[in-house]
C-alpha cells in the first residue's frame, strides 16, 4: 500500500492509504494486472495484513477520527517487545499492556484495534483488496503486538468471509512451545485460539543458518535439527508450519554460508522437512545482504531494473555458482510441487551418527529418504539401520541428479551433501 512517509517508506509497513498502491510501484490497476498475470501461471497472491500500526503520515493523522483511534501515552513509549508476556503464566498485566500498547517504532502510530470503527475500517479495507485483486492468502504482521484476543477475532472475521483462505502469522518467538501457542487448534491452558492456521518457524531458521558450519556434537551441527523436530509434539498441525532460511528482517543465508555446498544443504532441508517452505527472492542465486547494513538485505533482484548491470533472470546473467544453486533449487521445488509426500507426508527421523542425519517423508504411495552428510569428507552409510522405513526396497533415485542408488547394503554420501532419494523408483 501507499507508504508516503519521510523515511523508511520502502519497507511498506507504515501504510498511509489503505486503498492505494504506492505510486512508486504503480497504480491499483497495475496490482490487479499483476495478480491476474500470476494467476494465469498458477501463482496465487498473498497480502500482508498489518493491524498493529500505520504510517505516521497517514492522512487521518491530520484529523484523528476519535481519541482512542491510537494507543496514546503522555510521552512516547515503545513496546517492550517481550512477546513472552502472552505465554508467561506468571506475567504481569503491566508488561502485557506495554507490549501491546507501546509503539513498535516512533514513525508508526500504534493502532487500537479494540476501537470498533477502526476494526471495521481495516476489515473493509482488507476485504476490498481480497475481492479486487483476487487475493488467495494472508500474512499477519507482528501478530503478538496486538491485543491477541482482539486480533484473533479480527482474523476470524476475515476467515468467516473466506473460509478456504490460509492465514499465516508472524510470531517471532524463541521456542516451539511459544510458536505452537499461536497455531489455531492448539490446546492452550488459557483457552486462547489465535485463528492462525499457520505459524512461522523462526527457530528452524536459526538452525538452518548455523548447523552446516558447525562441527558435529551432542547439540551442534545436524543434532540441532534432530532436537528441533523432536519437539513437534507441541503443534496441532506440523504440515502448516512455514519454514524459511531468511527474510527481509534478518541476514540472508549467503551471510551464513559462502560455501555453495553448505548453502545447497540448507535449501535441501528447507524444501524437504515437514511444513512448507517460504522462498525469499534471491535465495535462488545466493543474493547477499546483512540486516544491519542499511537494510542491505533488501537489495533488488539483479535485472529487475533498467539500470542494473546484469540480468540474473537469465543463465547468462548469473555466475557459475549462482546457476548451480538456481538449478538445484528449481529441481527440488519442482519435485516437491509434484509429490504430495513432501507436502503432507509423515516424517520419521533418526538420531544423527558420525555426522550424518537421516529422515524420511512418507505416505501410503511413496517414501523419500533424505541423507545429510555434514562432514567435509565422504561417509559410508549402512542402510540396515533404517530397515523399518526402507523395508525391502533395493533401489532409490536422487531426485535432483536422477542417479540410481543401490540401497541394499551401504550408500556413500559425498562430504557436505544432502541426498534426496525417492525409494523404489525406476525410469
Question: Which residue ranges define each predicted feature?
Answer:
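Substrate-binding/active-site clefts of carbohydrate-active enzymes
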Residues: 1-128, 132, 151-160, 177-178, ...
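The substrate-binding groove and active-site-proximal loops of carbohydrate-active enzymes
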Residues: 12-27, 104-119, 136-145, 209-218, ...
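Active-site-proximal helices and loops of the catalytic beta/alpha 8
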Residues: 35, 53, 125, 131, ...
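Hydrophobic faces of well-ordered beta-strands that scaffold small-molecule active sites
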Residues: 45-47, 138, 167-169, 243, ...
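Surface beta-strand/loop "capping" patches
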Residues: 345-365
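Asparagine-centered strand-capping/turn motif at beta-strand->loop junctions
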Residues: 371-375
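Solvent-exposed beta-hairpin/edge-strand motifs
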Residues: 385-401
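C-terminal beta-strand-rich structural cap/linker in extracellular carbohydrate-active enzymes
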Residues: 407-427
Amino acid at each position: 500500500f501507499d507508504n508516503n512517509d519521510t523515511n523508511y517508506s520502502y519497507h511498506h509497513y507504515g501504510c498511509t492509504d489503505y486503498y492505494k498502491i504506492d505510486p512508486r510501484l504503480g497504480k491499483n490497476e497495475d496490482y490487479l494486472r499483476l495478480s491476474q498475470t500470476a494467476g494465469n501461471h498458477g501463482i496465487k497472491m498473498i497480502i500482508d495484513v498489518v493491524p498493529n500500526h500505520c504510517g505516521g503520515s497517514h492522512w487521518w493523522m491530520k484529523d484523528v477520527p476519535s481519541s482512542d483511534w491510537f494507543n496514546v501515552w503522555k510521552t512516547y513509549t515503545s513496546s517492550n517487545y517481550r512477546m513472552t508476556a502472552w505465554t508467561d503464566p506468571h506475567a504481569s498485566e503491566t508488561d502485557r499492556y506495554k507490549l501491546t500498547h507501546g509503539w513498535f517504532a516512533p514513525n508508526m502510530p500504534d493502532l487500537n484495534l479494540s476501537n470498533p470503527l477502526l476494526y471495521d475500517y481495516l476489515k473493509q479495507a482488507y476485504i476490498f483488496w481480497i475481492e479486487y485483486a483476487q487475493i488467495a492468502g494472508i500474512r499477519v504482521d507482528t501478530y503478538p503486538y496486538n491485543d491477541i484476543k482482539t486480533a484473533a477475532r479480527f482474523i476470524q472475521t476475515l476467515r468467516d468471509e473466506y473460509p478456504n483462505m490460509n492465514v499465516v502469522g508472524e510470531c517471532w518467538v524463541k521456542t516451539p512451545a511459544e510458536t505452537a501457542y499461536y497455531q489455531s487448534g492448539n490446546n492452550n491452558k488459557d483457552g486462547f485460539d489465535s485463528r492462525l492456521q499457520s505459524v512461522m518457524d523462526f527457530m528452524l531458521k536459526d538452525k538452518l543458518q548455523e548447523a552446516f558450519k558447525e562441527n558435529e556434537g551432542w547439540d551442534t551441527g545436524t543434532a540441532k535439527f534432530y532436537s528441533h523436530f523432536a519437539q513437534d509434539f507441541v503443534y496441532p498441525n506440523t504440515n502448516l508450519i512455514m519454514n524459511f532460511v531468511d527474510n527481509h528482517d534478518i541476514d540472508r543465508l549467503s551471510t551464513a554460508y559462502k560455501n555453495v555446498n553448505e548453502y545447497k544443504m540448507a535449501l535441501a532441508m528447507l524444501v524437504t522437512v515437514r511444513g512448507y517452505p517460504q522462498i525469499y527472492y534471491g535465495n535462488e542465486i545466493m543474493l547477499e545482504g546483512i540486516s544491519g547494513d542499511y537494510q542491505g538485505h533488501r537489495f533488488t533482484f539483479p535485472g529487475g531494473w533498467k539500470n542494473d548491470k546484469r540480468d540474473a533472470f537469465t543463465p547468462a546473467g548469473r555466475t557459475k555458482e549462482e546457476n548451480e544453486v538456481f538449478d538445484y533449487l528449481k529441481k527440488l521445488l519442482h519435485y516437491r510441487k509434484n509429490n504430495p509426500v513432501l507436502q503432507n507426508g509423515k516424517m520419521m527421523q533418526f538420531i544423527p551418527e558420525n555426522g550424518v542425519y537421516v529422515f524420511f517423508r512418507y505416505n501410503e504411495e511413496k517414501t523419500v529418504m533424505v541423507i545429510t552428510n555434514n562432514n567435509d569428507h565422504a561417509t559410508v552409510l549402512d542402510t540396515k539401520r533404517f530397515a523399518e522405513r526402507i523395508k525391502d526396497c533395493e533401489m532409490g533415485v536422487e531426485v535432483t541428479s536422477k542417479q540410481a542408488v543401490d540401497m541394499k547394503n551401504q550408500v556413500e554420501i559425498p562430504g557436505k551433501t544432502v541426498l534426496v532419494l525417492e525409494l523404489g523408483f525406476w525410469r
